[in-house]
């Protein structure tokens, strides 16, 4: 190994500038600085709770620099790690770098060991209330937002209807009777409680109970955020410029568990913005390994998986109790089910400002786009085909029909599990692609050239296990 130690040097947050600096090093030879700017008005917060969340991001974001040379020893100069926390970061690095091991032909069982430097495990609390939904630009986060808007009891302003009064019979009222009829009939305790709940719903909705947040890509995301129309929290992340320089030299490059970093960023945003729930949009298919390498399952979406989600929830539980919650609202759904719900609840509203494409964020553009050749474009077109009229769907790609593009046949064969492994990308399970293609073949007979098996009892609307709060499952998911 070129370097022996990866060093977590220190982190600093300036409440005036709202800038977090993270400092890392390799031996005494290299130093890196990464920054996060939280560009919004800060709420009152517990500085001790914030510091704990900052440490989590400090340790997680270091993976971008650690993976360049994979030093055998990790050294911590600032920040506390008890055994459970050290185990969490060790596992997340090791498993989250699965694709990295594969692409660079490294041992997929390479150990990553975070040192334990404390036996203390202190509980902090945050007083936040409300929902903080992540916006990534694609269909999944938009569906989450619309589901919360429509079904969560504290994100709607629809009042409880007044109980209708019986009509008076004509010619039977004296002047005394008429004065009595104008009085409000006393409401029952349950009706009063319902009205109180309606007022509370309206109050919370008006005060920003449901809000959104994002990391980077502000020019491209602004039209989408404006269309959503909710209070939004912007975060800007800046990598150390040496990352690109060293990647062009001798550093190793490859996929990192970016959603694990976003999970830690979201927790900080929740504390700084006075929110409780960090709501993500990771679906059931994120649990499926992309391929197997030297006997080890490799999952491109590991940090979107339920396994990571439950590990991170356990970390937050030890650190913050129930005062901060992290979960994915879409975990019970398959990708095809998500596409169906998105088509029904959100497509027409967002069709000209959303994109699930890998190349959506062109830095010289002020809007997102679709490339029409990447795995996510191909998969998105496939799963939306059964639920959106052809002309509307083709319009997203400038009139192009991706299913009929001969150049994309090899990619669709991968998605369908006909040839090779599934693409190393955020795409659905093979059986979901097959179910979507089966429906698409009813519209396009020319797609019958794709031959595959699909279990007769496969139900894409089946609800899968999830690790979300019970009230979200009951009040939102089961109401759709």
Summary of predicted features, one role per range:
Residues 1-130, 141-142, 147-152, 210, ...:
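RNA-binding accessory domains that recognize and position tRNA/RNA substrates
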Residues 1-22, 29, 296, 318, ...:
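ATP/NTP-dependent adenylation/nucleotidyl-transfer catalytic domains that generate, transfer
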Residues 65-77, 270-278, 384-395, 442-446:
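Short helix-capping/linker segments at secondary-structure and domain boundaries
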Residues 153-171, 176-187, 193-201, 205, ...:
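Short, basic, low-complexity termini and linkers enriched in Ser/Thr/Gly/Pro
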Residues 212-250, 276-290, 305-321, 327-338, ...:
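A conserved beta-strand->alpha-helix junction
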Residues 250-257, 296-304, 326-333, 368-371:
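Alpha-helix capping and helix-loop boundary segments enriched in small/acidic/polar residues
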Residues 257-260, 264:
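Phosphate/diphosphate-binding loops
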């Amino acid at each position: 190994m070129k370097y022996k130690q990866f060093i977590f040097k220190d982190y600093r947050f300036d409440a005036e500038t709202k800038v977090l600096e993270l400092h890392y090093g390799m031996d005494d030879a290299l130093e890196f600085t990464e920054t996060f700017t939280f560009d919004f008005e800060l709420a009152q917060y517990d500085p001790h709770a914030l510091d704990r969340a900052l440490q989590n991001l400090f340790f997680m974001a270091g993976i971008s620099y650690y993976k360049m040379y994979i030093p055998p020893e990790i050294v911590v100069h600032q920040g506390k790690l008890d055994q459970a926390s050290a185990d969490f970061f060790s596992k997340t690095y090791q498993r989250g770098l699965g694709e990295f091991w594969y692409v660079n032909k490294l041992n997929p069982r390479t150990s990553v060991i975070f040192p334990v430097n404390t036996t203390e495990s202190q509980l902090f609390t945050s007083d936040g209330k409300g929902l903080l939904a992540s916006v990534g630009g694609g269909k999944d986060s938009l569906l989450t937002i619309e589901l919360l808007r429509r079904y969560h009891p504290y994100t709607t302003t629809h009042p409880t209807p007044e109980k209708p009064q019986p009509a008076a019979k004509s010619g039977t009222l004296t002047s005394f009777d008429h004065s009595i009829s104008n009085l409000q009939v006393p409401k029952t305790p349950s009706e009063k409680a319902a009205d109180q709940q309606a007022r509370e719903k309206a109050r919370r909705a008006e005060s920003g109970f449901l809000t959104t947040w994002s990391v980077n890509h502000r020019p491209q995301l602004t039209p989408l955020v404006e269309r959503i129309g909710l209070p939004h929290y912007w975060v800007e992340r800046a990598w150390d410029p040496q990352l690109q320089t060293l990647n062009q030299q001798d550093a190793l490059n490859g996929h990192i568990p970016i959603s694990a970093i976003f999970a830690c960023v979201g927790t900080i945003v929740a504390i700084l913005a006075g929110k409780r729930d960090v709501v993500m949009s990771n679906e059931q298919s994120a649990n499926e390994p992309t391929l197997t390498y030297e006997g080890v399952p490799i999952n491109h979406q590991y940090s979107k998986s339920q396994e990571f989600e439950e590990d991170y929830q356990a970390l937050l539980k030890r650190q913050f109790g129930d005062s901060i919650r992290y979960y994915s609202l879409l975990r019970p759904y398959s990708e095809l089910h998500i596409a169906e719900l998105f088509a029904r609840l959100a497509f027409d509203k967002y069709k000209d400002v959303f994109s699930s494409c890998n190349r959506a964020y062109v830095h010289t553009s002020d809007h997102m786009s679709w490339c029409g050749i990447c795995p996510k474009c191909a998969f998105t077109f496939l799963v939306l085909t059964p639920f959106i009229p052809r002309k509307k769907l083709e319009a997203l790609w400038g009139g192009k029909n991706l299913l009929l593009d001969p150049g994309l046949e090899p990619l669709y064969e991968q998605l369908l599990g006909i040839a090779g492994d599934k693409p190393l990308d955020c795409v659905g399970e093979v059986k979901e692609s097959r179910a979507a293609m089966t429906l698409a073949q009813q519209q396009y007979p020319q797609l019958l050239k794709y031959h595959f098996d699909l279990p007769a009892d496969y139900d894409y609307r089946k609800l899968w296990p999830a690790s979300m709060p019970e009230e979200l499952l009951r009040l939102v998911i089961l109401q759709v």
